[in-house]
UniProtKB/Swiss-Prot annotation:
May be involved in several stages of intracellular trafficking. Overexpression of SNX15 disrupts the normal trafficking of proteins from the plasma membrane to recycling endosomes or the TGN. Its main location: cytoplasm. This is Sorting nexin-15. SUPFAM superfamilies: MIT domain (SSF116846), PX domain (SSF64268). Residues 253-263 have a biased composition (Acidic residues). The keyword Protein transport applies.
Amino acid sequence: MSRQAKDDFLRHYTVSDPRTHPKGYTEYKVTAQFISKKDPEDIKEVVVWKRYSDFRKLHGDLAYTHRNLFRRLEEFPAFPRAQVFGRFEASVIEERRKGAEDLLRFTVPIPALNNSPQLKEFFRGGEVTRPSEVSRDLRILPPPLIPTPPPDEARLLQPLPAERRGQEELEVPVDPLPSSPAQEALDLLFSCDSTEEASSSLARGPLSEAELALFDPYSKEESTGPSPTHTGELAAIEVESKRLDQEPWEPGGQEEEEAEDGEPAPAYLGQATELITQALRNEKAGAYAAALQGYQDGVHILLQGVSGDPSPARREGVKKKAAEYLKRAEMLHTHLP
């Protein structure tokens, strides 16, 4: 299988819409967006519903892989501990939602994690769709419900024995799915070429610098600075950053704003400008992981907002800007020592 996932797509993860499953536990909607670097309007989306125990298992698997990468640039995110009492409180549910989202977003700039077989398996069962072509109403499941079962099903909801209470969260149901075109489409979004190499490397001990450099563009970041070419690019970025602070995103600038009856620029442009401006500063300061996340978040907001923008000229300008910063993010992977 080719490395299409790493080379052709940027990723954006969200965890949202917690709801109560009919069996009594809380589950969360997990959305993975794969944005084509060649065409920012080409977006593939995978949606799955997961519970706390699924996130906890993924956290353990990815933490193990991360430890064996010997990365010194960032700390692997912590994850909320399991608890029996209070797990249905709003604050606990929100803490778990945020912890799960932080975990998924942490994997984005690390190829060994974002193309891992564990992450691909986590999204197994989700259908690959194109949000721009499919009505979202068809993808939204019914709202949270706690149904009242008919009398003949009452026995299914009997309370667990005392010795089993508290263990329900820690159990991960196994539900193998047969191969299908939908799963083949999912496989194409996750590159697992180096699965066998990674497994053998973990078994024989720490990875060498040369091995890390094959799939980790930040492996030498702590010991070496940016290349001369990249230093020159960052000088230009500083000028671009100052311009972003002063100019709107519209291709026609102030004249276009006046031509549109003085209406203020849409809110999504301001949000994206703030994120991408900070990303430019982070890149200049050498905080490449933070810069990459900032580019992705900013482009995500642009692509979400531009679809409803009433101005054709502004839509065209925003699409060009999104493409520019997708390329900027790609350079963080390909141009660093």
